[in-house]
């Protein structure tokens, strides 16, 4: 297993790391078994959160007393709530100190949650502080603020020149850069492409898995990394990147409110993937998501959402595919609630 240093933190982590969002779909014991299998294969870096449906507890049970690097998150901007979140995570993770606590996609960089995490760090309960976001400008600002040791942002082989600037900035500052969405929320079906992308860059991807077969695929790539010098592979890599790049949504929400038809483009284009990473009941328990998704039928292809996207992503077709997936689950909702 390839090991790297996470910025200037001094933490040595596996280049192949694991994100725990999909574990929400698994039972407790099944999750613990899969996490331990990851550890047995040499993976030592695991990203969790206080709002991933019991993920902290699963990680804590899997690795109590083991030498792993755990990154969790506080999903609030309020001091008191963040303080309580850290206390809960310490108990759930069964540790005396958490290696990395990240602010979870906040709108403000300097907020009450940061104050709570800094206080916990002074008291020895947190070793390093990170920042996660889906917004590139916010990621750049957080990196330049001097307040954080790591940045977590959506990156994969579909990323472009703008994201390359974030990678260069973090490298120049000695910051650890963690990549969420290494498979673009399920869009990338050939893991070798993203694996090859990350092997060339000083970025640590967190792969979300929920099956041993997915772990086996990652380990196979560790043992036999794809060769970018291979002309056939390189051509396939570039062709797939061009085909998919314009449909990759980072989830930054810059398109909020621009759709004349009232579509929540940020979520409407991605909810199809959510069903395969989260418990379907989350979106089927009442009519709220059903009502939101009905607006997709009113899309006129005006392109206003494309015009405001910082990356020029075109989510019109992904939205329609997501609508079809949603309705398939909706018709079987009694199976999930």
What is the predicted role of each segment?
Residues 10, 42, 94-97, 125, ...:
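Conserved functional loop/turn residues at catalytic and ligand-binding sites
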